[in-house]
């Protein structure tokens, strides 16, 4: 997810409050549509094709068809659909059609759709559910507007806040309108929004209180801090308490120190403890240092089994201590962190970063008494365990960011830079390792490259040029990204142009997209011509990126060259996906921590569910680790590389829907629109800012306690779909 959504037809108030452990196949009564029409619609979505075929379905006599076609138009995102969607919103007799039209307009994220949504929002005759989707859509449009449209953005955000205030003052405020209004405020960030959000902290509904606090945290508004300090102590809902801690940390509310410390060490819910630990790190109150070290020690002294659930808290404590003890060389903290280094074999970046922030001198000396010994030790670390090498590289890169006041900063930087240079030269070492399984040392190289680049060494261009020729696509992508960060030059242009033909033949598009981005930064005709060569790519994402970059560089409007997706799916694939609609489909995910069950949502995301089911049936996920765990946010998996960059060798289109990201929602991880493949995530807590941005294709209906216990490094044993 780099990471970094919702359902398909109308949501009633009672269903918005649906528990994540309740059956949630469809949030709106679904009227049947023929298989033939569904396949037509889904094929158009999959191909990202907006044409007369889909346009004609928007005027179909059957409102169910119009609803589904409107959703498809929103997913495709072509501005040419806005006129008809706006017409549906303003004039269709069916409420469900108008709701979906509003949702779809918001998905297009174009200012051209704003007037229709504003009219619906301000209408005195429109239903609250349609107006709720209108306020949601306006929030998306406001968030997507460029800085040049600041005046228009302010107009939209003001209308959003006014509408939310009016709804709050009504005799019976609509639950869904309030929730979607809060998220719209979060996205549009109107002036004085903190006052409105603070009023919602008194709401009787826990979800509304939690979402209001979430919005206050993300906007860093202090208006409700007094109330939030009390909620942190007394609210019965853990999501409210956790979000209260987040706000108090984000706004650096020093008066809340005692309450945050109590929550960090004694709250019964790990999500609250984690949020409070993070908040204490931002307050930078030295009183927290010893208390958190004591708390961390109390966990690690329990002699826990490998990969315990408590690992998540240990890593959060380590991160906090790195901030609180920065440059203080506290021996107690360093000794505790050293135990973590041994336990994780240096593979936890949180521990490595904390250690180097507290004592860069001691960190560097820990790898050897002299530079040659340390260089060889780190080469061996990278070769044997790329995760360890990558984590150490991040820590070495941190030394480049030391305050200028550090007395021996120059010596520390010189030492760290030479160690990173040695790690990049691991192939030239005489270290020979015999291993039955591939070590994939190259997976750690991108972090080493990024760390090395942070020192701005004299040979950086030469080093990046060399790595542009590596076999690993992610290494080449990283080298291209870093070249793009350097001042534009003819030499950089030449290297990037030379690297383009190979990237155009890759199965994965990471390198070519990075090369195109960096070419665009060169701002010269040679680079622009090279970008134009990718307009003929068979990869829709590459063509789309090339068109966007050329437009930004004023090198021409080639929008007509984007075309449609050359999809992998056949008619049989579409029929198989459609056949699951209306049926209960579940996946049992067995991990090293136990099993949890997902109710898949083929009604909402048929092709995403089909892709997941097909991968699972092939055993694709067997043995893959949870490579990313962010407590109180998500657990993420599905990357065969394990570094967050891997996938199945193809991408699928987003099937964004109206299903909200409640606790236990299952979504597709992305690095941009339509970039999903095999990586997916499960949310620990509601994440409304993800709604309408990432495909929700399932919900955990049992075993959420297993999800809560998962840590980075846990493994998938099997996934069975039935």
In which residue ranges do the predicted regions lie?
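Bacterial N-terminal signal peptides that target proteins for export
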Residues: 1-10
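Bacterial N-terminal signal peptides
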Residues: 9-19
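N-terminal leader/linker segments that initiate helical-solenoid repeat arrays
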Residues: 24-75
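Structural signature of alpha-helical solenoid repeat scaffolds
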Residues: 39-42, 74, 106, 139, ...
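Amphipathic alpha-helical scaffolding segments comprising HEAT/armadillo-like alpha-solenoid repeats
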Residues: 46-59, 78-90, 110-123, 144-168, ...
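Alpha-helix N-cap/helix-start positions at coil->helix boundaries
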Residues: 48, 63-64, 79, 94-96, ...
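Alpha-solenoid helical repeat scaffolds
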Residues: 68, 84, 100, 116, ...
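Cyclophilin-like peptidyl-prolyl cis-trans isomerases
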Residues: 462, 466, 470-474, 485-722
């Amino acid at each position: 997810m780099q990471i970094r959504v919702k359902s398909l037809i109308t949501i009633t108030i009672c269903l918005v409050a649906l528990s994540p452990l309740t059956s949630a196949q469809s949030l709106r009564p679904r009227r049947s549509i023929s298989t033939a029409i569904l396949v037509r619609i889904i094929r158009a979505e999959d191909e990202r094709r907006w044409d007369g075929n889909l346009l004609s379905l928007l005027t179909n006599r059957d409102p169910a068809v119009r609803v589904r076609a409107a959703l498809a138009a929103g997913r495709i995102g072509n501005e040419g659909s806005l006129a008809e969607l706006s017409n549906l919103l303003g004039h269709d007799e069916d409420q469900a059609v108008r709701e979906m039209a509003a949702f779809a307009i918001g998905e297009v994220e174009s200012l051209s759709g704003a007037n229709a949504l504003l009219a619906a929002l301000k209408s005195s005759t429109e239903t609250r559910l349609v107006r709720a989707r209108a306020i949601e859509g306006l929030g998306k449009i406001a968030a997507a507007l460029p800085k040049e449209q600041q005046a228009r953005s302010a107009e939209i955000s003001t209308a959003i806040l006014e509408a939310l205030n009016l709804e709050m003052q009504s005799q019976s405020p609509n639950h869904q309108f309030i929730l979607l209004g809060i998220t719209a405020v979060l996205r549009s960030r109107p002036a004085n929004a903190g006052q409105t959000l603070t009023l919602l902290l008194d709401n009787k509904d826990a979800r509304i209180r939690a979402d209001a606090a979430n919005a206050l945290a993300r906007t860093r508004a202090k208006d409700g801090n007094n109330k939030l300090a009390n909620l942190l102590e007394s609210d019965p809902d853990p999501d409210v308490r956790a979000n209260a801690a987040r706000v108090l940390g984000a706004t650096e509310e020093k008066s809340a120190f005692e309450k945050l410390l109590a929550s960090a060490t004694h709250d019964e819910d790990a999500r609250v403890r984690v949020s409070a630990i993070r908040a204490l790190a931002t307050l930078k109150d030295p009183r927290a240092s010893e208390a958190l070290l004591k708390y961390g020690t109390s966990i690690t002294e329990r002699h826990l089994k490998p990969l315990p659930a408590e690992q998540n808290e240990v890593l959060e404590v380590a991160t906090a201590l790195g901030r609180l003890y920065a440059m203080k060389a506290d021996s107690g903290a360093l000794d505790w962190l050293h135990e973590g280094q041994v336990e994780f074999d240096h593979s936890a970046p949180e521990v490595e970063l904390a250690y180097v922030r507290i004592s860069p001198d001691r960190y560097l000396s820990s790898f050897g008494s002299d530079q040659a010994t340390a260089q060889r030790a780190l080469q061996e670390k990278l070769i044997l365990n790329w995760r360890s090498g990558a984590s150490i590289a991040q820590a070495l890169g941190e030394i480049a960011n030391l305050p200028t006041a550090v007395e021996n900063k120059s010596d520390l930087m010189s030492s760290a830079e030479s160690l990173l240079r040695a790690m990049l030269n691991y192939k030239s070492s005489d270290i020979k390792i015999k291993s039955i399984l591939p070590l994939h040392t190259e997976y750690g190289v991108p972090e080493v490259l990024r760390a090395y680049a942070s020192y701005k060494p004299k040979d950086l261009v030469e080093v990046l040029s060399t790595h542009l020729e590596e076999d690993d696509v992610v290494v080449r992508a990283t080298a291209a990204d870093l070249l793009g960060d350097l001042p534009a030059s003819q030499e950089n242009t030449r290297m990037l142009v030379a690297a383009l033909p190979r990237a155009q033949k890759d199965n994965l598009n990471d390198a070519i997209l990075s090369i195109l981005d960096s070419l665009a930064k060169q701002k010269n005709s040679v680079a622009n011509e090279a970008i134009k060569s990718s307009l003929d790519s068979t990869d829709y994402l590459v063509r789309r990126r090339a068109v966007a970059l050329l437009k930004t560089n004023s090198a021409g409007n080639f929008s007509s060259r984007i075309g449609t997706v050359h999809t992998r799916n056949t008619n049989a694939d579409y029929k198989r996906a459609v056949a699951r609609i209306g049926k209960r489909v579940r996946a049992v995910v067995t991990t090293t921590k136990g099993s949890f069950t997902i109710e898949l949502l083929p009604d909402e995301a048929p092709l995403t569910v089909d892709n997941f089911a097909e991968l699972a049936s092939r055993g694709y996920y067997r043995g893959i680790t949870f490579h990313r765990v962010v407590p109180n946010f998500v657990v993420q998996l599905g990357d065969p590389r394990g570094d967050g960059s891997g996938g199945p060798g193809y991408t699928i289109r987003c099937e964004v829907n109206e299903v909200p990201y409640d606790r236990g929602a299952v979504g597709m991880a992305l690095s941009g629109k339509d970039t999903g493949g095999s990586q997916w995530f499960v949310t620990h807590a509601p994440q409304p800012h993800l709604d309408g941005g990432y495909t929700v294709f399932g919900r955990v209906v049992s075993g959420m306690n297993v999800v809560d216990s998962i840590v980075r490094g846990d493994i998938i044993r099997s996934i069975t779909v039935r």
